[in-house]
């Protein structure tokens, strides 16, 4: 499919920017990935609605991403249109103890905003680099807290290309999952419920949490955080370490010697390097412990 003319048509419908053959490594925290045929940075939710309608009319596949912090894009890239819900949709406002935010805002921004307004419940978000939309899709969490604890409702673009409000009860939240993706819904706005809490206390708890997180997690190399979900009652990192997985390397992809559930990009790692390493770790853990690890990161694109 020739995307140059399609890019021009789409640009006439939206205010955000369109790129052709956009390297996806620029849009993931792993700094890995091939090119997207078409790439849209929407300026608002109407841009997304227009782009989805256009793509469906032209039979162009649609992929929606957030900050790319939990994402591995394969080396062959992504066919069709990639929509990045990002900085054009990152406004955050407050109403009483409720916070409204665009799905492109980042979790740390939400945590800082809540702290400045003396609202508790958002400490878990301080050290997670994901966007709010992406975090809701996977029910992101840390520090004994997660998205579903404080989310109130969201606005989605539904299957009929209409905006719809859904309360969190409609999202079937579970450990690191929701039903947003399987239903083909695109989160564009979010609403969160906090509670009154002393700002100084929030700041101190957040500093302590971030210090512990920094001490326990690798620093200095691109990564996607935890690669595998923790099995019930156990930790993926402990199982991988128990198999001697720390320090294993394929190409420039290496299992961190500090946290075995993290795979680092030492410089020029490819998606194939990471996938080979993932398969090897899964096999090692299953043979040693009888546990089949499940991916927490999402894999997109073509080989």
From Swiss-Prot:
SUPFAM superfamilies: FAD-binding/transporter-associated domain-like (SSF56176), Uridine diphospho-N-Acetylenolpyruvylglucosamine reductase, MurB, C-terminal domain (SSF56194). It catalyses: UDP-N-acetyl-alpha-D-muramate + NADP(+) = UDP-N-acetyl-3-O-(1-carboxyvinyl)-alpha-D-glucosamine + NADPH + H(+). The keyword Protein transport does not apply. The active site is at residues 176, 226, 296. It holds the Pfam family MurB_C. It is found in: Cytoplasm. The keyword Cell cycle applies. Pathway: Cell wall biogenesis; peptidoglycan biosynthesis. Its cofactor is FAD. Residues 32-212 form the FAD-binding PCMH-type domain. GO terms for molecular function: FAD binding; UDP-N-acetylmuramate dehydrogenase activity. It comes from the Bacteria. Keywords: Cell cycle, Cell division, Cell shape, Cell wall biogenesis/degradation, Cytoplasm, FAD, Flavoprotein, NADP, Oxidoreductase, Peptidoglycan synthesis. NCBIfam families: murB (TIGR00179), PRK13905.1 (NF010480). Cell wall formation. This is UDP-N-acetylenolpyruvoylglucosamine reductase. It comes from Desulforamulus reducens (strain ATCC BAA-1160 / DSM 100696 / MI-1). The lineage of its organism: Bacteria, Bacillati, Bacillota, Clostridia, Eubacteriales.
């Amino acid at each position: 499919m020739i995307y140059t003319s399609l890019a021009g048509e789409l640009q006439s419908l939206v205010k955000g920017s369109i790129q052709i053959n956009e390297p996806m490594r620029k849009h993931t925290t792993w700094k890995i990935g091939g090119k997207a045929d078409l790439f849209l940075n929407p300026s608002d939710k109407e841009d997304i609605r227009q782009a989805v309608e256009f793509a469906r009319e032209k039979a162009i596949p649609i992929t929606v991403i957030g900050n790319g912090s939990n994402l591995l894009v394969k080396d062959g890239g992504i066919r069709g249109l990639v929509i990045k819900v990002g900085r054009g949709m990152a406004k955050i406002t407050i109403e009483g103890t409720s916070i409204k935010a665009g799905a492109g805002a980042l979790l740390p921004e939400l945590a800082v905003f809540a702290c400045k307004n003396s609202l508790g419940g958002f400490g878990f978000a301080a050290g997670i680099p994901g966007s709010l939309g992406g975090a809701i899709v996977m029910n992101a969490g840390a520090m004994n807290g997660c998205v579903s604890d404080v989310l109130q409702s969201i606005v989605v673009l539904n299957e009929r290309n209409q905006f719809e409000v859904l309360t969190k009860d409609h999202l079937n939240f579970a450990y690191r999952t929701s039903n947003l993706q399987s239903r083909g819904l695109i989160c564009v706005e979010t609403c969160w419920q906090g509670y009154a809490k002393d700002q100084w206390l929030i700041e101190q708890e957040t500093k302590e949490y971030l210090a512990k997180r920094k001490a326990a997690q690798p620093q200095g190399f691109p990564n996607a955080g935890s690669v595998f979900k923790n099995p019930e009652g156990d930790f993926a990192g402990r199982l991988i370490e128990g198999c001697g997985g720390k320090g294993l390397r394929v190409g420039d992809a290496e299992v961190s010697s500090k946290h075995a559930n993290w795979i680092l990009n030492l410089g020029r790692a490819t998606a194939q390097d990471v996938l080979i390493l993932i398969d090897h770790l899964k096999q090692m853990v299953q043979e040693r412990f009888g546990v089949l690890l499940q991916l927490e990161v999402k894999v997109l694109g073509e080989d």
